[in-house]
């Protein structure tokens, strides 16, 4: 890693990143395979359980790969022999996976260094580490959204052509061989046209090369948000130096400059005045984003117009305006990070008395609420074969061959993870129903394995069976308040947000 930093420091003055020679270094693939960049603090999170090839790394295979690349016959061999296993015991696309992993590891370096340098200048590294949890978004919602009026529910459009992804990287990395190699990946895998596909409100990814996929997707999303950042920086009284990278990009103003002038009615400063809104907030996770404001519906329509026109002229594809929904908080609920959130208006009357006169004062309070969406969650549990489409628990036959302890541990872990993730719910009834489904599904699976009834099996296990499904908070409260006979749901009315959740739960991600 230090060698990479030294190399890039020398080339930074030329604003060029010649990354292609790194592909011929053996340790690149060891670094990519072992996820060394993630361990050392890479900005791109990748689940360790997602892997496209055998976890056992072989230096011999890497040397053969490097040799074939030097001989300039790898491209021909990969095209003619893409469906055959190259080595016994390894996946058929091992070479392509290794190169894509190495390419992703190399191309991450300039972006990682740029982010690290910007954080060092602003001295925000400890702050950014504390806010890595996606649960940190919801306390922000609690503080801000109750004072706002309108919200735009935005689905970031997906690229219609993979060449768009190459052009995005071209604005940041002026290394033609590396970009040609990326194009080769796209042409070799015919099914990569489904690299980014629309699936409800989220994006689906192929799992063959997850590191490269996530990097390309993050780059694309940053480009989609560039118009938002650009306008906010230009409209700010305190100009930030972080808007500098926009000036370095070769095609930014050529592509959208003229179109922006038309939209702004030849007066850019008057248009920027519309965006000087101190009560506007923007939050995004994956392909779903929220734009909220305290100002009028007209301003939100202006933002929608700018987003749609920018996506059309900059990415050369038609962006459906229906992907941006503008609504009032008082009568709208939006899905975000697996929660169904809203800001309802609660009217109340307060009686006031002054001397002999008394009168009623009508007041309105707004409170941010987060609810577990039970119907989509039942759909996710049904797809995972924990219940049927009606929410009735069923046994999971594929786990019936495991030991009793493994079955209970798996169900208990899923239940605790969901309880941990949905700990910030305002109303716990839906969460208790999900836990009931998982507990009874576990009991049915064990009863199926032992060819017994659920009632008989629960009587034999007793309370020890239920303890596996308790969260740490429930165990602590049961020790502190052992004599209180109130049911558990009365003890958990307060929302709890955790700072150790760095990605969305898999079952929740089906929403």
UniProtKB/Swiss-Prot annotation:
Where does the record say this protein resides? Plastid, Chloroplast
What are the alphabetically sorted keywords of the record? Chloroplast, mRNA processing, Plastid, RNA-binding, tRNA processing
Q: Which residues form the signal peptide?
A: none
Q: Biological process (GO) annotations?
A: mRNA processing; RNA splicing; tRNA processing
Keyword Protease carried by entry: no
**HAMAP family cross-referenced by the UniProt entry:** MatK
| PANTHER family attached to this UniProt entry | MATURASE K
- The protein's name is Maturase K
Q: Which gene encodes it?
A: matK
